[in-house]
Amino acid sequence: MISPKETFIYYQELLEYISKKLDYDLQLIQRKTYGEINELLRKGEIDLAFICSGPYAARKELYGFEALAVPVIRGKPFYQSYLIVNKKSPYNKLEDLRGRVFAFTDPESNTGALVPKYWLALIKETPDSFFHEITYSYSHNNSILAVAKNLVDAASVDGHIWEFYNRNNPTYTEETHVIKKSIPFGSPPLVVSRYLSEKLKVNISTLIQTMHTDPQGIRILNKLMIDRFVPPEEEWYQPIKKMYQYLSFTGK
């Protein structure tokens, strides 16, 4: 699965598919930060969104998220965080990055912020104590580009997005090297606002979970590197909750 910021046209096709099948007008809205999208959902100003697994696991009650479906990619409804460095760099493990420049994606990102902070906490460090400088790229492809061009020494990114570019446009991923991968987490879910009608929630859920049986749906899914959508399981997001709890307990 790839994020809307990187693939506007493919997600536009997905929304048009839902709109046509359900006779319900949908428009694609993008914002710079995850927090902005989450707040729009909380206020009921948008109906549905693909959101990061981090905010879903930790703050779904606050924002009123209700997960309808999760993408299955390469046969699994999971994704990982990849710690990447430039392929010509001498860095082979997290500890080698002490005193270097690191790029997070978004402050609320699971793979692009929470995971590397958790890794550092395990060695009794924080981003400020460990890195010389940190920056926020606000998208995974920006982080990949920054590492490839040596604008930063390392970054933590969504493994699905790295794999998408490595397969379809490896210009920059081939300049990077993955030195660490996280455990699997539940993939970013499709969620709806608490204000959406129950009937529409059911209709959207049914449609998106069966689109892999429709030729047009298959074409759209293939472009997004999604096999199909399945119902979410809360246990897939428990490891994320545990990371939040660990960071809160340790003060890291």
Region spans (language model):
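Pocket-lining segment of extracytoplasmic ligand-binding domains
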Residues: 100-199
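Extracytoplasmic small-molecule ligand-binding "clamshell" domains
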Residues: 1-57
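Acidic, polar ligand-binding/catalytic clefts
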Residues: 31, 39-96
